[in-house]
Design a protein with these regions (language model features):
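Mature, structured domains of secreted/extracytosolic soluble proteins
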Residues: 2-19, 23-337
Length: 337
């Protein structure tokens, strides 16, 4: 499979702590937009001080204050904070800092704790591949940090959000600025898909597909699902719930499994490269990565027509949707085997 190497590891603080001594960061990204600027010199400010002083974290400052975390992030630590920029908050649907402050404090606290990891982890200490890091969120709080290297450099991401400024040092830890707000998972892949109204026809197809499909999408094995939207299904003979329920189960099962990747289990979009991807069973689709983070898929049964992995839009996340057992990317065409 031509995916950038992803190594799943639950050995977090033990492995990473042993790598911290003596490291300094030299990090080059795949393009200027993704290039993590680095500030390796130890700072004299706490994480809270850094957030307050920075003009790119005004939304985050509002969130920290509303969530009651200013004292925590000024504490001894050490902490690693994946800090969404103001642009990241805008992309999540917050118009300004006032809109952030108007959000429920319990909601903001849950989201922010999902960005805070115990321990100080500079980007240079993050192993190549994918590493599971538990956050300060007690329920469904694991994040997945990926470091992938190509001919043009090395990039670091967390749950698909790119690190755009790495290693801002504080007296009580380190801050990595990221380009997207991380949303904690609300359930497994099946539950997340069922709760999304734009994927209701996919939900009907899964139900028609039978216990094996349901078990796979709700099980413990990590997986990646390329999820056709309702519009994608409407362009096929399976364009209504009635049509789906009238379809042969075997045919639907073959189609559905062609959208599931189990190796690697969590393929976040920054880690996908051009080339074949083996789907569940013996199927295969071909990925093509273009400029501007464009990503398309080609399946043998689509007659040369590609399926596009949808870009995130303001207030709507379409790719790198995290579930407790995997990740979902919405696509605009059903992948026919």
């Amino acid at each position: 499979m031509n995916l950038k190497s992803i190594q799943f590891s639950r050995k977090t603080s033990g492995i990473l702590a042993s790598l911290l001594v003596g490291f300094s960061l030299t990090l080059t990204s795949c393009n200027d937009d993704d290039n993590p600027n680095t500030t390796p010199t130890p700072g004299s400010s706490t994480i809270t001080d850094l957030v307050v002083a920075s003009d790119q974290f005004t939304f985050l400052e509002a969130a920290v204050v509303k969530a009651g975390l200013t004292t925590t992030l000024s504490g001894t630590g050490p902490f690693t904070v994946f800090a969404p920029t103001d642009d990241a908050f805008r992309a999540a649907g917050f118009a300004d800092a006032a809109a952030v402050s108007a959000a429920p404090d319990t909601t903001l606290r849950r989201i922010l704790l999902y960005h805070v990891v115990g321990g100080s982890y500079p980007a240079s200490a993050i192993p190549a591949g994918q590493t599971a890091l538990p956050t300060s969120l007690s329920v469904n709080g694991t994040t997945y940090v990926s470091k992938a290297t190509s001919t043009s450099g090395t990039g670091v991401s967390v749950n698909g959000a790119r690190v755009i400024t790495a290693d801002v040092q504080a007296t009580n830890g380190v801050v990595h600025a990221i380009d997207r707000v991380l949303m904690p998972p609300t359930g497994n892949v099946l539950q997340v898909a069922q709760a999304d109204t734009s994927l209701s026809l996919l939900g009907a197809a899964v139900a028609r597909g039978g216990a094996a499909v349901v078990t796979a999408l709700s099980g413990a094995t990590p997986l990646t699902v390329f999820a056709p939207t309702n519009a994608a299904f409407r362009a096929t003979p399976y364009n209504t719930v009635a049509a789906i329920n009238a379809a042969p189960v075997a045919a639907l099962t073959a189609i559905l499994t062609n959208h599931v990747v189990v190796n690697p289990g969590r393929a976040f979009s920054p880690t996908i490269v051009s080339g074949p991807i083996t789907t569940f069973g013996t199927g295969s689709v071909t990925a093509t990565v273009g400029s501007g983070n464009a990503l398309t898929l080609l399946s043998p049964g689509n007659g040369g027509q590609v399926s596009t992995v949808l870009q995130n839009t303001t207030g709507v996340q379409n790719r790198d949707i995290t579930a407790t057992n995997g990740v979902i990317h919405k696509i605009d065409r059903v992948l026919l085997p």
